[in-house]
Amino acid sequence: SMSESMSELEIARIQVILQYLTVHDTINSAKAAELLDVEKKTASRLLSKAEKVEVLISKGKTKDKVYMKK
């Protein structure tokens, strides 16, 4: 589950992303970084973590990867 494998900060950030995804279909790491005011690599790590715990799903190759709600 999300709470076991993530810090409170990560969970809070994922909530922001999920909120964004209620309005938009997809998000990428650049947009997530902007939204969370973090570096792009931090955002990508967070997105892939969210995918690992099955909160998000992704499509596309690394460079153009987008994430959406499961």
Model-derived segments and their meaning:
Residues S1-K70:
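C-terminal regulatory or interaction extensions
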